[in-house]
Each structure stands twice: as C-alpha cells, then as structure tokens.
Amino acid sequence: MKKIIFSILSVLMCSTAFSQNKLVALSFDDGPNTTTTVQMLDVLKKHNVKASFFVIGKNINDESAKVMVRAHNEGHDIENHSKTHSAMPTLSADSIKSEIEFTSALVAKYVGERPQLFRPPYIALNQTMFDNIDLTFICGEGSNDWEDNVSADQRVEKILASAKDGLIYLLHDFEGNGKTVEAVDRIIPVLKERGYTFVTVRELMKQKNIKPQKDVIYTDVLNVSKWKEK
C-alpha cells in the first residue's frame, strides 16, 4: 500500500512540475533564405532550441528550400506566412485561398507535411481571412526587429522584458537581419537561466492544452480572446 501511495504521489508531483514549466516559443518570419536563416539555424542548434519558421512562398526556390528542409530535419516547424506577403484584407476570398495553398503545397513538397499555423502579413486581418483559411492564426510579441535602426541591444532588452509563460515571440529571419540573430544568441541562455524552456509554437499549444479556436489569433496562448472586425 505504501508503495502504491508513493507511486501516486510521485506521478502527481511530476505532473504538477510539468504543468508549471515556463514555456515560450521563438518564431521567425519572411524566410527561407541562404543567409540569415542559415545563421539563425546555427544559433538554435548551438543552444539546442527548436523554433517555428513562417515562410513566404515566393521565397522558396531550389536553394532556399534546402535550408527549409534542414530546419525541418533539425526539429523546427515550418509554417505559412502567405505567398507574396500582401495585405490580405485587400484580397478576394479566392486570392486568399490561393496565397495559402501555394505556400502550403510547396512546404509539403519539400518537407513532407503541410503547415498547421498561419501568420498574417502585417498582422492585417478581416473576417474573410478567418472564413477561408483553415489554419490556426498566430501573432506574437515583437521587438521591432524589422527596423534596421533598432539595435541588437534594444532587441535583447525588449525580448527579455516581455518574457512570460505561454508567450510566442514574433521575430524575423529575412536577409540581412543579423541583429536578430545576435539578439537570439544572447537571450536564449538568459531565459533558460530564468527557468524558461523553448518549444515550437505547435508544442507550446500542445503542452499548455490549448485547442485552436476559430476567429482567434494567438500571441499569449494562456490569455486569448475572440477577434472582432472593427
């Protein structure tokens, strides 16, 4: 009986510890490419961290596809960031579907599975997009890292200051964005020291028992609300 009680208590303690684990997800927009994406993958490999890459269909070619395949093979998730990075609320329903299908089909061609998540270009939304895109919508906490005048130090400061359990970070691996590569290299050991574990966005939602909802765009998976068109 004592052994049974001890076993039950051990399971409960392990379950509690797991549920209280602080998780964050790094995600990167605007690849793939053969420069910055490669540098980012090297940094993630150095720190043994998995992340999510939201790719633009028009950026996938024979060479950049090899980088995307590397990312997938190293345990990162490949997600959808549209075909052309257009402001999608200006598009028709058919054009929206085409933007998504083009990229999803290319990702499936090269890595063997279709994206499950979608990040809208410019985080521009309307109801037509929700009605015609059968993927989970993802936003994220940014650090203005698309602006070249934002230094690596400023990016590090912003990323560290916004850290909290359940957060998705929205960063960029477009060509020439080396300051974000530097920032990520610096913030990972700091956040690990603070008790955070890095996972992909899919894994974040899985471990936090989040079932994707319609008409929701996720930044903090533990604090969500329905999107409403203004």
Place the predicted regions along the sequence by residue.
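Terminal accessory/targeting
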Residues: 1-26, 38, 42-51, 164-230
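Active-site beta->alpha N-cap acidic-glycine motif
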Residues: 20-87, 95-96, 102, 106, ...
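A broad, low-specificity signal for short, low-complexity segments enriched in glycine/proline
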Residues: 39-40, 79, 99, 129-134, ...
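Catalytic domains of cell-wall/extracellular-matrix polysaccharide-remodeling enzymes
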Residues: 62, 73, 86-192, 196-197, ...
